[in-house]
From Swiss-Prot:
Catalytic activity of the protein: L-aspartate + ATP = 4-phospho-L-aspartate + ADP
InterPro entries (alphabetical): AceGlu_kinase-like_sf (IPR036393), ACT-like_dom_sf (IPR045865), ACT_Aspartokinase (IPR054352), ACT_dom (IPR002912), Asp/Glu/Uridylate_kinase (IPR001048), Asp_kinase (IPR001341), AsparK_Bifunc_asparK/hSer_DH (IPR042199), Aspartate_kinase_CS (IPR018042)
GO MF annotation terms: aspartate kinase activity; ATP binding
UniProt-annotated location(s): Plastid, Chloroplast
Naturally occurring in which organism (per UniProt): Arabidopsis thaliana
This protein's encoding gene: AK2
Residue intervals of the ACT domain: 401-479, 481-544
Presequence positions on this chain: 1-84
Enzyme class: transferase
Protein name: Aspartokinase 2, chloroplastic
Keywords recorded for this protein, A-Z: Amino-acid biosynthesis, ATP-binding, Chloroplast, Kinase, Nucleotide-binding, Plastid, Repeat, Threonine biosynthesis, Transferase, Transit peptide
Tissue expression: Expressed in stems, leaves, floral organs and young seedlings.
Gene Ontology cellular component terms for the protein in this record: chloroplast stroma
One matching Pfam family: ACT_9
Pathway linked to the protein: Amino-acid biosynthesis; L-lysine biosynthesis via DAP pathway; (S)-tetrahydrodipicolinate from L-aspartate: step 1/4; Amino-acid biosynthesis; L-methionine biosynthesis via de novo pathway; L-homoserine from L-aspartate: step 1/3; Amino-acid biosynthesis; L-threonine biosynthesis; L-threonine from L-aspartate: step 1/5
């Protein structure tokens, strides 16, 4: 009998008569019984020519040895992998005390090996934007006196001291922020690209402080900037989209590092890197949820946990009606509609990676961790469900577009929506009849602009549409969206109109979307909150 050991990067094409051939899943290791050594040695040597293998012959066994991938293991060496994402928003890490509570919360789940995603400390993003706006006009010599800059420095340095970590973990970023504001002041402009770079300091500092604290208390952690670990986006500054190349890149970095050092990853939410510009981009406000679900899909984790300051998804905004209740289960469709129409719990686009990866999302309250929260999955039993939640979207502009040209004609709707496309204005809710179209404009895409720009855009829009129709512009409207089982729309609408009639409210527009989970109604702004409270009482506090 004989044994061969082959060392190299490719498996030679050998024609061996074998009684036993075994392949490991990762190691490309085989054993084979041979009748003699000399003939096989010549065959192997010939087959391995130009492949770069070293061949040696011993007795008893043949092994092809190849470098094995490092096994993933936890700090106790048990070979365990990362299990979930835990994402915490700004209010959950707004102070040293809250960061300590979050750390204790994480440690209270000893069976979890989480990836942590953090937002900036509470109010930091708004303060950074305000500081940037002031820097444009204040002059270079006055940058130091910008109130918001002083607030940010004081908050983060105080937090470092109270956590008992070295201020050196954030000093470079505080100095970088100061220099950036000076640059903005010198240039006298704040571009979208610079705005994204400016707000990135918030997440970069919060994650460094939190990671340092975890290490201080003996829980090994490592900080990551999302834009350095593979979050590749479009170059649409302030509202970038994540590209598919992100998923393998993020997986390679996080899984590879975890397998080597078992340090809990602490990742910046909200941020990415433009694929052309290589500049820092942001995913839009609330984009930390999208960061969390993207990581969950990239790593194929068991669950994505989004920790907020409310007990999961609620039946309505508790600021409008304090008696709002927690919703135990949602589908991704329901969650997406809730987010789009104004619920502040989830980012509108954050559900897509979780849905694609079929990964449950659990929304919980970091102030009340024992509360069950809300679990969002691909499907749920809707047989007894009627209404899930009521969402209010304020300050909406409504357009009534009427023309007899619509009657029996084709192409009219195309002309209308081409006008919106040409002016870069998003449409929210749409309803049509034989001779008219009613629609609302997405305030998130319109009201974020300067007042003068908004007025000009609306004037231009009306002017263009009046070339083909009679246009009526109606402002100060609200959308009340009813999220639930639209298969029971007759029952829902019957109760809705009973409530509105008893409160003397007229519905100006109604739309049922193709999502099959949403009915939207348009009312005057001043009537909206009254309607939400009355609807909540009718659907959630009385017998069906």
């Amino acid at each position: 009998m004989a044994s061969l050991q082959l060392y190299g990067v490719k498996t030679p094409g050998l024609a061996l008569s074998s009684k036993r051939l075994e392949f490991a899943s990762k190691g490309a290791c085989f054993s084979v019984t041979l009748p003699s050594s000399s003939a096989v040695f010549r065959d192997v040597e010939h087959s391995c020519r130009n492949i770069g293998l070293r061949v040696s012959c011993e007795a008893l066994r043949v092994d092809l040895l190849q470098r094995k991938e490092p096994e993933t293991c936890d700090s106790s060496g048990t070979g365990k992998e990362l299990t979930c994402v835990m994402k915490f928003g700004g209010s959950s890490v707004e102070s040293a005390e809250r960061m300590k509570e979050v750390a204790n919360l994480i440690l209270s789940f000893p069976d979890e090996r989480p990836v942590i995603v953090l937002s900036a400390m509470g109010k930091t993003t708004n303060k950074l934007l305000k500081a940037g706006e002031k820097a444009v006009t204040c002059g270079v010599t006055n940058v130091e006196s910008i109130e918001e800059l002083s607030f940010i420095k004081e908050l983060h340095l105080r937090t470092a001291h109270e956590l008992g970590v070295e201020t050196t973990v954030i000093e470079k970023h505080l100095e970088g922020l100061h220099q950036l504001l000076k640059g903005i002041s010198m240039m006298k402009e704040l571009t979208l690209r610079t705005r994204d770079y400016l707000v990135s300091f918030g997440e970069c500092m919060s994650t460094r402080l939190f990671s340092a604290y975890l290490n201080k208390i003996g829980h090994k952690a490592r900080q990551y900037d999302a834009f350095e670990i593979g979050f590749i986006t479009t170059d649409d500054f302030t509202n970038a989209d994540i590209l598919e190349a992100t998923y393998p890149a993020v997986s390679k970095t996080l899984v590879g590092d975890w397998s080597k050092e078992n340090a809990v990853p602490v990742v910046t939410g909200y941020l990415g890197k433009g694929w052309r510009s290589c500049a820092i981009t942001t995913l839009g406000r609330g984009g930390s949820d999208l960061t969390a679900t993207t990581i969950g899909k990239a790593l194929g984790l068991r669950e994505i946990q989004v920790w907020k300051d409310v007990d999961g998804v609620l039946t309505c905004d508790p600021n409008i009606y304090p008696g709002a209740q927690s919703v135990p289960y949602l589908t991704f469709d329901e969650a997406a509609e809730l987010a789009y129409f104004g619920a502040q719990v989830l980012h509108p686009l954050s559900m897509r990676p979780a849905r694609d990866g079929d990964i449950p999302v659990r929304v919980k309250n970091s102030y009340n961790p024992t509360a069950p929260g809300t679990v969002i999955t691909r499907s749920r039993d809707m047989s007894k469900a009627v209404l899930t939640s009521i969402v209010l979207k304020r300050n909406v502009t409504m357009l009534d577009i009427a023309s007899t040209r619509m009657l029996g004609q084709y192409g009219f709707l195309a002309k209308v929506f081409t006008t919106f496309e040409d002016l870069g204005i998003s449409v929210d809710v749409v309803a049509t009849s034989e001779v008219s179209i009613s629609l609302t404009l997405d305030p998130a895409k319109l009201w974020g602009r300067e007042l003068i720009q908004r007025v000009n855009e609306l004037d231009n829009l009306v002017e263009e549409l009046e070339k083909i129709a009679v246009v009526k512009l109606l402002q100060r409207r609200s959308i009340i969206s009813l999220i639930g089982n639209v298969q029971k729309s007759s029952l829902i609408l019957e109760k809705v109109f009973q409530v509105f009639r008893s409160n003397g409210v007229n519905v100006q527009m109604i739309s049922q979307g193709a999502s099959k989970v949403n009915i939207s109604l348009i009312v005057n702004d001043e009537e909206a909150e009254q309607c939400v409270r009355a609807l909540h009482s009718a659907f959630f506090e009385t017998d069906p």
